[in-house]
């Protein structure tokens, strides 16, 4: 059955990954030791997408945990779900990447990468029909960004026809952890544009805003942020893990969401938002879910979709919901907000429905949108990159690891191209599109 192999790299990736495994173990009725004590057959039916059934009736995640320093791994291992993972699947170095993309991609990370690929290969061989890979990492650091993108391109080489989805935490405008974030992020985006099939962009600042504005948490911890991310990851992967009336898998999602191969950076949202450990205080209805889901305040990336247009989007509903009601609501949203959807892709909203709600909720919805406003995010990083690169600030850390300045220039222009592509399709109209098609036809004939 369509398995997915999960990789988590770097500190951020491992913390988000741990939260994700905790969430879906709960949904499938597994305890911290991987023993099943659930209540419904639905939990078992497609357990094998993410879990391997081992001896002693234990379920083991198909997860590979990677880091260049042992700290985060130890934290995962000693956490409540530490015994869940297969001990051989922890692959770590000792030196750390020190927030340096070049260390993760070229020196330290490159030494460890073969060891990781062996584990990935072993996991892939244990699958009946591997659907693809998902990777959690941040783009601002050294290991998640540098080594994460190295792994993506290596896995791409070895499994060219499998899907590659990434959950990438992008640097946020106000909350910055390191000065060299713009460098690391630009170099990573340069890789993701080429090697990933779908990238779900998550942004710490947007998560902080949700925690403070919507959930009224005065001092959100990373635990609270990771809880939100794991809710989205669980939502995006629901239809792979549970039966439903309208299912989608990674490939179906990509086919419906990516109109042009380079434009595969998605904004994600989730409704209803609840804080960790808290439950919803009122009954939620489908209209409310759709309303909340399309609310800019619910987006987990700090770019406002009202400044751009949706090329495509997808809504995944969970719970006992009537299909008709969902379709009516989605049509309603499209009719009311026509200006936010490009008119040259008719019916560009895809819906999926799954009958099993997340724990503690009657129904929920996950939103994935391919909006041209994501360019704001790249623009912002690009401006910060340009400001530092103009003075060649901090560059010696990268060139010292064997990188060349050309690589920075290439990465910068690739990201600028991405921004202008998004802008071009934002402004495109139906008639223009027709002219372009005609022009292409004429060129073809001449050839």
UniProtKB/Swiss-Prot annotation:
Record keywords: Cytoplasm, Cytoskeleton, GTP-binding, Magnesium, Metal-binding, Microtubule, Nucleotide-binding
SMART domains linked to this entry: Tubulin (SM00864), Tubulin_C (SM00865)
Entry binding sites for Mg(2+): 69
Gene assigned in the entry: TUB2
Cofactors (names): Mg(2+)
Description of how the protein assembles with itself and partners: Dimer of alpha and beta chains. A typical microtubule is a hollow water-filled tube with an outer diameter of 25 nm and an inner diameter of 15 nM. Alpha-beta heterodimers associate head-to-tail to form protofilaments running lengthwise along the microtubule wall with the beta-tubulin subunit facing the microtubule plus end conferring a structural polarity. Microtubules usually have 13 protofilaments but different protofilament numbers can be found in some organisms and specialized cells.
Molecular-function GO terms, alphabetical: GTP binding; GTPase activity; metal ion binding; structural constituent of cytoskeleton
PROSITE patterns: TUBULIN (PS00227), TUBULIN_B_AUTOREG (PS00228)
One GO CC term on file: microtubule
Residues the entry annotates as binding GTP: 11, 69, 138, 142-144, 204, 226
Name of the featured protein: Tubulin beta chain
Function: Tubulin is the major constituent of microtubules, a cylinder consisting of laterally associated linear protofilaments composed of alpha- and beta-tubulin heterodimers. Microtubules grow by the addition of GTP-tubulin dimers to the microtubule end, where a stabilizing cap forms. Below the cap, tubulin dimers are in GDP-bound state, owing to GTPase activity of alpha-tubulin.
Subcellular location field: Cytoplasm, Cytoskeleton
Organism of origin: Penicillium digitatum (Green mold)
Biological process (GO), any one: microtubule-based process
Keyword NADP (UniProt): no
InterPro entries: Beta-tubulin_BS, Beta_tubulin, Tub_FtsZ_C, Tubulin, Tubulin/FtsZ-like_C, Tubulin/FtsZ_2-layer-sand-dom, Tubulin/FtsZ_GTPase_sf, Tubulin_C
Family the entry assigns: Belongs to the tubulin family.
């Amino acid at each position: 059955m369509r398995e997915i192999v999960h990789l988590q790299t770097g500190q951020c990736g491992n913390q988000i990954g741990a939260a994700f495994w905790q969430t879906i173990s709960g949904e499938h009725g597994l305890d911290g030791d991987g023993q099943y004590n659930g209540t419904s057959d639905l939990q078992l039916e497609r357990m094998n997408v993410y879990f391997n059934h081992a001896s002693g009736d234990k379920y083991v995640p198909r997860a590979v945990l990677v880091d260049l320093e042992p700290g985060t791994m130890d934290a995962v291992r000693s956490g409540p779900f530490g015994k869940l993972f297969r001990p051989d699947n922890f692959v770590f170095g000792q030196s750390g990447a020190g927030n340096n993309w070049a260390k993760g991609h070229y020196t330290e990370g490159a030494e460890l990468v073969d060891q990781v690929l062996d584990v990935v290969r072993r996991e892939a061989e244990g699958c009946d029909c591997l659907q693809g890979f998902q990777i959690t990492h941040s783009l601002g650091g050294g290991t998640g960004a540098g080594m994460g993108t190295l792994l993506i391109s290596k896995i791409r080489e070895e499994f060219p026809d499998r899907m590659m989805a990434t959950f990438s935490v992008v640097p946020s405008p106000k909350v910055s952890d390191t000065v060299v974030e713009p460098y690391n992020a630009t170099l990573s985006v340069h890789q993701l544009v080429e090697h990933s099939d779908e990238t779900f962009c998550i942004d710490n600042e947007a998560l902080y805003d949700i925690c403070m504005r919507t959930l009224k948490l005065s001092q959100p911890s990373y635990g609270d942020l990771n809880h939100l991310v794991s809710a989205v990851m669980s939502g995006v992967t629901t239809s792979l893990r549970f039966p439903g009336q309208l299912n989608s898998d990674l490939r179906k999602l990509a086919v419906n969401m990516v109109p042009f191969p380079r434009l595969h950076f998605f904004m994600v949202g989730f409704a209803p938002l609840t804080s960790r450990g808290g439950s919803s205080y009122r009954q939620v209805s489908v209209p409310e879910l759709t309303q909340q889901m399309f609310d800019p305040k619910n987006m987990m990336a700090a770019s406002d979709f009202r400044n751009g247009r949706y090329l495509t989007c997808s809504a995944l509903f969970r719970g006992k919901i009537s299909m008709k009601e969902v379709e009516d609501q989605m049509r309603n949203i499209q009719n009311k907000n026509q200006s936010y959807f490009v008119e040259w892709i008719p019916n560009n909203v895809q819906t999926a429905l799954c009958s099993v709600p997340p724990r503690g909720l009657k129904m929920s919805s996950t939103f994935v949108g391919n909006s041209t406003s994501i360019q704001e995010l790249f623009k912002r990083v690009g401006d910060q990159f340009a400001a530092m690169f103009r003075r060649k600030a901090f560059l010696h850390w990268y060139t010292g690891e064997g990188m060349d300045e050309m690589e920075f220039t290439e990465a910068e222009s690739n990201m600028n191209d991405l921004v202008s592509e998004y802008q071009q399709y934002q402004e495109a109209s139906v008639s223009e599109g027709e002219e372009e098609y005609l022009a292409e036809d004429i060129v073809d004939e001449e050839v």
